[in-house]
Amino acid sequence: MDLYTLLTSALCTLALPLLLLLTAAKLWEVYCLRRKDAACANPLPPGTMGLPFFGETLQMVLQRRRFLQVKRSQYGRIYKTHLFGSPTVRVTGAENVRQILMGEHKLVSVHWPASVRTILGAGCLSNLHDNEHKYTKKVIAQAFSREALANYVPQMEEEVRCSVNLWLQSGPCVLVYPAIKRMMFRIAMRLLLGCDPQRMDREQEETLLEAFEEMSRNLFSLPIDVPFSGLYRGLRARNLIHAQIEENIKEKLQREPDEHCKDALQLLIDYSRRNGEPINLQALKESATELLFGGHGTTASAATSLTSFLALHKDVLEKVRKELETQGLLSTKPEEKKELSIEVLQQLKYTSCVIKETLRLSPPVAGGFRVALKTFVLNGYQIPKGWNVIYSIADTHGEADLFPDTDKFNPDRFLTPLPRDSSRFGFIPFGGGVRCCIGKEFAKILLKVFVVELCRNCDWELLNGSPAMTTSPIICPVDNLPAKFKPFSSSI
């Protein structure tokens, strides 16, 4: 066989599969676009639909932030794609996001990807709708009342101080992100589920934390439950978590609750009993898992970002310490120490600005998911009924007209109150509308306690400098933020 014949054969062998792939991709796009609403004259947003069935999920999962940045630069604030098995429109920008968040029940409804719904379960607050969501949220909200938060502060302080002291004794390198996750996990177990973390040995704690990590990594995956798939691994981790939580729930059902301070899980149990309903163990496990996931994952992300920004901006750290000194909080001597309380924490105005600026630049949750209840028009484009809508928090913060020099860390920008008009949707770290994060005040108080304990006890430096960040699905440093801690001696 001569060289020409070999080359021709090789080209045909390569060209045929490529041609079939391109043809399949084109037919897939035609199929997806036929789902547009013919009764609406407005066009679909620009964008591409990827490969048959997979859409652009694989690219998004593998490339994460890079994928979103490229799409944003190519197509602008609104574009179409195909993610997690559904045609999807991704939305950025304060005014566009405002219409989505304020359109709950009218234009859109919460609708997480199938993998998230399967792993977290139908009984968790994020997946409930209408009256069921309303009543469950009202019950859980009691765990985040001002009275409840006031009772949490001493326990938060105890757990944070214990962790900070451990870092000071841990030698030349502490991996900050895993250490903070462990701390926030203990706090969430103690305050939200009423479980004493002291009863769990280190091995059990690590196993449960690893299970949460595995579940978190695989929350957003293709809805294919086969061995070694993302959904399969996520469900296996979820089942391990449920088994541990079930033991805690059964113990809780057998003992008398503290009438003065009830955790969120106890409130859900009491709600079922008051209504004469049988205890739904599966729903309680799903609610408890969601509370633990939201209660430690997002706060750990924010606290890690705070640690990073304060280390990189010594002028801001000095301002925080001056505020602590003004409030009598800088000294760690027992005879001079002022007791932390919710009233004292609310006086820390500049510290609040630092937390807000951290949440602006590094919001723990990148966005939220909705589904169109009917076809509607957004900024000139049609969003067909049944299509998923993802609104972006991080990108909206990054381009908000509300903030000059959006890429600069400047807490002073929050010393002036935000306007109450639609531009306020340029800052939405906790979402907005009726689906606004139920635990946002809990998170704010916890982050303030963390800043107080960190800044009055420690000096620290980042061993790798400014960290690269990734989203999986919560924003976190790629290198786990290695740092060196040493005791702080007040000289202000």
From Swiss-Prot:
Its main location: endoplasmic reticulum. Heme binds at C437. GO terms for molecular function: all-trans retinoic acid 4-hydrolase activity; heme binding; iron ion binding; monooxygenase activity; retinoic acid 4-hydroxylase activity. CDD domains: CYP26A1 (cd20638). Its EC number is 1.14.13.-. Induction: By retinoic acid. GO terms for cellular component: endoplasmic reticulum membrane. It is found in: Endoplasmic reticulum membrane; Microsome membrane. Keywords: Endoplasmic reticulum, Heme, Iron, Lipid metabolism, Membrane, Metal-binding, Microsome, Monooxygenase, Oxidoreductase. The keyword Transferase does not apply. It is an enzyme of class 1 (oxidoreductase). It holds the Pfam family p450. It catalyses: all-trans-retinoate + reduced [NADPH--hemoprotein reductase] + O2 = all-trans-(4S)-hydroxyretinoate + oxidized [NADPH--hemoprotein reductase] + H2O + H(+). InterPro entries: Cyt_P450, Cyt_P450_CS, Cyt_P450_E_grp-IV, Cyt_P450_sf. PROSITE patterns: CYTOCHROME_P450. It is a peripheral membrane protein. Its cofactor is heme. It comes from the Eukaryota. GO terms for biological process: central nervous system development; retinoic acid catabolic process; retinoic acid metabolic process; sterol metabolic process. Belongs to the cytochrome P450 family. A cytochrome P450 monooxygenase involved in the metabolism of all-trans retinoic acid (atRA), a signaling molecule that binds to retinoic acid receptors and regulates gene transcription. May regulate at-RA signaling during hindbrain development. Mechanistically, uses molecular oxygen inserting one oxygen atom into a substrate, and reducing the second into a water molecule, with two electrons provided by NADPH via cytochrome P450 reductase (CPR; NADPH-ferrihemoprotein reductase). This is Cytochrome P450 26A1. It comes from Xenopus laevis (African clawed frog).
